[in-house]
């Protein structure tokens, strides 16, 4: 109550922020006549002037009014488009590390040019982030003329681009790309083996389009760079065969309950669990398939991986549906994004789930992958010094943006008042009744010439509606992941009079639906159109546009509520753009997933009490409230999951930052010999301490064990026992010094053979490879730890604290292993004298000649022989071949230098 009174007096925080920013809008407007007087050359020279002022210490914020005025005037000259005052407000919000909520059709793409230009003046690079490659390319090409007019370079970062092209894109003042590609480039840069391989600069300013889609919907999706693990495709196929024998466990209070089934399903948590009866049957079937021995338990330690395969196969069959969660195209299982309905080419589910789905669909099973590097979007985008974003629907997630990303959400007012009519939801008992009602509504409205957009939550549902429309004889277009290539054309014409378009999740589509259709699309189909043709097309469009407005504008039909209110609002937001007329309504049934899982019992009882008849809909505030509560429940649960994910990932993030910092320092120096010497001292001290405890009696020393360890791990022959027998006066400290000095002498002799430069490069290479290998193993160990850490709760321990404690111990152990393995590898490497290499090469040539004379071998036998032992190589050592000394370097960079 008190807060409401205070808000009325002082205004909300949103109002106060906009009031402050409007003062700057007035300043920019006053500068407009001055900018109009400037010639093109004088306007373009402003960029250099601003940069000079920044170098002299002027703050970026002080330049804002002038810079925005320059962009506004340049846009008028280049595009013939003037930034509205609300777009200037949006630009200021984006410059202040905030989220700007701007409704669909308010010109977010043009708004982004303002903060992008201002922050590009620093020369530190601006990253504009979009949800897909099409939008990245479109926005970059659309805005390129403006930025180039102002003297700024524009780069596009697309998947599959070679490193030099990516480096050039990142070197540009403003770079457009997708969230995935920016994240993957960051990971790849931190796997590089030379500074030249890196493509990104230091992360400065990210401007994220559809920020809710990227920072919230995809927050649970980690970016993973992986390498192939062992092939277990046969096991997936065998396990897949047993799943159809299992029966689902029904609820005990349901009509179909007939005793215990083999597995139960928790739809809320998306989990499947075997029952006792199911476990017995699975074990019997696995024994029958010859996968498991008679009498073995699926839960025994030796069968943990087998249990993992069974769970993955069960989830693939029960929780993942074709044309909902994925599609099968050209013999490949492609994931469908649950939020946008787009296919995610190249993405794969982890933990063997993707292979299980491939086995279920009987397509080629690709090998499982092992994680080499990974990061979540939450942690990647928090690496930027400055982060901002824009979307049409952010206010419902304002708390999450604030608590996780420290970003405030500011709702920017529309340029014209919103007049769309949002009609109350209609709820039916069955799915079929709901579909019938939707078809009737479409018939009535399309006859009047009103365009209709039908939003569905999956490809499967879009095809159900499509079939019903075909049956009713209503012409329509379908926009889903299966017709991805036709997207731009379908959306461009969705606003035509009487057009019916079915779309799977309009979130992140990035294209406005213009009433009367898109006249620009018509012009684009003409070859070299003249001004007269363009004028005719515009005039015809104006007539169509007015007719559609008279019919009521674009009507939105939602076929069911999404888990998130924000996705529903995005669908609604496609109508009523820029003050146009429009309407929206959601049709629901008690068989919808959201209603069935979260709101079914209460609403079903309510509908029964109201005496519902078949085909009759309920339209009541109670029902709307129950649905809103169900959505809030899901949103709250999803937020908790994302928050928990972040808390766990923050532990890995700190370790990742430490490893990547150390790795980059390694890359940037050419000589790490001092580091190697320091590590060697630590390793030998620790090793000797294990066998000769400090300040201990000689009787406690294990000299034989130490000799064996030095031989096995460091290739050092040291007769320690003989030294002690021969020199009774040899005490502990002197012995330690002798062991270390002899190890150092052996290493220096190797260095003399290959040369200082080769050894420095080799040390660096060994350090990087060992670090990468151990980091990869550490990531896998962290995954395993995380999967089972929740069980610590049963022992009255906090799983998060346990995870932090254990992961820190694992990290410390990994760093110790790094030191040990680096010194062990460097000690074991065999180097050869130049004359030995010549003798070896002569021997290889003779062997090759002998093999060439044996003509009786078939080609196949010859091939198998040549790919066998290296001693049977049939050609001289090439300059790019591995050096025979075992250093791992190319011959030309190692002993090949000595042959010159």
Curated annotation (Swiss-Prot):
Subcellular location: Cell inner membrane; Cytoplasm
Zinc as UniProt keyword: yes
EC code(s) of this entry: 7.4.2.8
Region called Disordered, residue ranges: 849-900
Molecular-function annotations in GO: ATP binding; metal ion binding; protein-exporting ATPase activity
Reactions the enzyme catalyzes: ATP + H2O + cellular proteinSide 1 = ADP + phosphate + cellular proteinSide 2
Cofactor: Zn(2+)
Name of one Pfam family that matches: SecA_SW
Signal peptide: none
Regions of compositional bias (Basic residues) in chain numbering: 889-900
InterPro entries, sorted: Helicase_ATP-bd, Helicase_C-like, P-loop_NTPase, SEC_C_motif, SecA, SecA_CS, SecA_DEAD, SecA_motor_DEAD
Membrane association type: Peripheral membrane protein
Record: residues binding ATP: 87, 105-109, 512
Family: Belongs to the SecA family.
Function field: Part of the Sec protein translocase complex. Interacts with the SecYEG preprotein conducting channel. Has a central role in coupling the hydrolysis of ATP to the transfer of proteins into and across the cell membrane, serving both as a receptor for the preprotein-SecB complex and as an ATP-driven molecular motor driving the stepwise translocation of polypeptide chains across the membrane.
Subunit structure: Monomer and homodimer. Part of the essential Sec protein translocation apparatus which comprises SecA, SecYEG and auxiliary proteins SecDF-YajC and YidC.
Name of the protein described by the UniProt record: Protein translocase subunit SecA
Species in which this protein is naturally found: Pectobacterium atrosepticum (strain SCRI 1043 / ATCC BAA-672)
């Amino acid at each position: 109550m008190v807060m409401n009174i205070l808000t009325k007096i002082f205004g909300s925080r949103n109002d106060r922020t906009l009031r402050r920013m409007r003062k700057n809008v007035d300043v920019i407007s006053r500068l407009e006549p001055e900018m109009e007087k400037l010639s093109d050359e004088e306007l373009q020279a402003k960029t250099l002037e601003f940069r000079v002022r920044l170098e002299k210490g002027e703050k970026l914020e002080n330049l804002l009014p002038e810079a925005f005025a320059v962009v506004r005037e340049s846009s008028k000259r280049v595009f013939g488009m003037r930034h509205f005052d609300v777009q200037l407000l949006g630009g200021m919000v984006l410059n202040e590390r905030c989220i700007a909520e701007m409704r669909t059709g308010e010109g977010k793409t043009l708004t982004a040019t303002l903060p992008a230009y201002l922050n590009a003046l620093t020369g530190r690079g601006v990253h504009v982030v979009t949800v897909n490659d099409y939008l990245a390319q479109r926005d970059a090409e659309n805005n390129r003329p403006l930025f180039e007019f102002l003297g700024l370079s524009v780069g596009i970062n697309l998947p599959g681009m070679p490193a030099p092209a990516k480096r050039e894109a990142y070197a540009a003042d403003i770079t457009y790309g997708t969230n995935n590609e920016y994240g993957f480039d960051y990971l790849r840069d931190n796997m590089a083996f030379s500074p030249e391989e890196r493509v990104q600069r230091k992360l400065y300013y990210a401007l994220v389009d559809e920020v809710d889609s990227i920072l919230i919907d995809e927050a649970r999706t980690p970016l993973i760079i992986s390498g192939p693990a062992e092939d277990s495709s046969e096991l997936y196929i065998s396990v897949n065969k047993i799943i159809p024998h299992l029966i689902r466990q029904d609820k005990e209070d349901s009509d179909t309950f007939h005793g215990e089934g083999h597995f139960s399903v928790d739809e809320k948590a998306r989990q499947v669990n075997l029952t006792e009866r199911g476990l017995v049957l699975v074990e019997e079937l696995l024994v029958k398939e010859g996968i498991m021995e008679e009498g073995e338990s699926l839960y025994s330690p030796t069968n943990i991986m087998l249990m993992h395969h069974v769970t993955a196969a069960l989830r693939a069959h029960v929780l993942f549906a074709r044309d909902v969660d994925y599609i099968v195209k050209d013999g490949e299982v492609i994931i469908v994004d649950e939020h946008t309905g787009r296919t995610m080419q190249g993405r794969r589910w982890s933990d063997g789930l993707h292979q299980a789905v491939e086995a279920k669909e009987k397509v080629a099973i690709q090998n499982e992958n092992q994680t080499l590097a990974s990061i979540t979007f939450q942690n990647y985008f928090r690496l930027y010094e400055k982060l901002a974003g824009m979307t049409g629907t952010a206010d419902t997630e304002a708390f999450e943006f604030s608590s996780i990303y420290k970003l405030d959400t500011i709702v920017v007012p529309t340029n014209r008042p919103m007049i769309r009519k949002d009609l109350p939801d209609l709820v039916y008992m069955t799915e079929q009744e709901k579909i019938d009602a939707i078809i009737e509504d479409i018939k009535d409205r399309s006859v009047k010439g009103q365009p209709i957009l039908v939003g569905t939550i999956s490809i499967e549902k879009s095809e159900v509606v499509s079939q019903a429309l075909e049956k009713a004889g209503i012409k329509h277009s379908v926009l889903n992941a299966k017709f991805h290539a036709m997207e731009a054309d379908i959306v461009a014409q969705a606003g035509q009079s009487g057009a019916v378009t079915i779309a799977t999740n309009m979130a992140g589509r990035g294209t406005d639906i213009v009433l009367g259709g898109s006249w620009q699309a018509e012009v684009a189909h003409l070859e070299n159109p003249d001004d007269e043709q363009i004028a005719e097309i515009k005039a015809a469009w104006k007539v169509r546009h007015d007719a559609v407005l008279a019919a009521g504008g674009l009507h939105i039909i939602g076929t069911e509520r999404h888990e998130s209110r924000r996705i529903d609002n995005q669908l609604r937001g496609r109508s009523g753009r820029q003050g146009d007329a429009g309407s929206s309504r959601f049709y629901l049934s008690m068989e919808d997933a959201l209603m069935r899982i979260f709101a079914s019992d209460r609403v079903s009882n309510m509908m029964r009490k109201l005496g519902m008849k078949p085909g009759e809909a309920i339209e009541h505030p109670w029902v709307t409230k129950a649905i809103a509560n169900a959505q809030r429940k899901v949103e709250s649960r999803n937020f908790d999951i994302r928050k928990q994910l972040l808390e766990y990932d923050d532990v890995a993030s700190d370790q990742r930052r430490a490893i990547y910092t150390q790795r980059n320092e390694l890359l940037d120096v050419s000589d790490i010999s001092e580091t190697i010497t320091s590590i060697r001292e630590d390793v030998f001290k620790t090793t000797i301490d294990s066998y000769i405890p400090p300040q201990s009696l000689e009787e406690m020393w294990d000299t034989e064990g130490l000799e064996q360890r030095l031989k096995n791990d460091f290739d050092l022959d040291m007769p320690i026992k003989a030294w002690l027998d021969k020199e009774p006066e040899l005490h502990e400290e002197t012995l330690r010094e002798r062991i270390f000095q002899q190890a150092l002498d052996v290493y220096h002799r190797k260095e003399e053979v290959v040369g200082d430069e080769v050894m420095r490069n080799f040390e660096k290479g060994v350090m990087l490879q060992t670090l990468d290998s151990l980091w990869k193993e550490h990531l896998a160990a962290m995954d395993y730890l995380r999967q089972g850490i929740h069980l610590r709760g049963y022992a009255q321990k906090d799983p998060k604290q346990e995870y932090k404690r254990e992961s820190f111990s694992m990290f410390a152990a990994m760093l110790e292993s790094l030191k040990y393995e680096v010194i062990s590898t460097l000690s074991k490497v065999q180097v050869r004298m130049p004359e030995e290499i010549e003798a070896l090469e002569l021997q290889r040539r003779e062997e090759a000649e002998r093999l060439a004379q044996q003509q009786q071998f078939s080609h196949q036998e010859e091939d198998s022989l040549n790919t066998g032992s290296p001693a049977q190589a049939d050609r001289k050592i090439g300059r790019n071949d591995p050096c025979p000394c075992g250093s791992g370097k190319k011959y030309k960079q190692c002993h090949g230098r000595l042959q010159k």
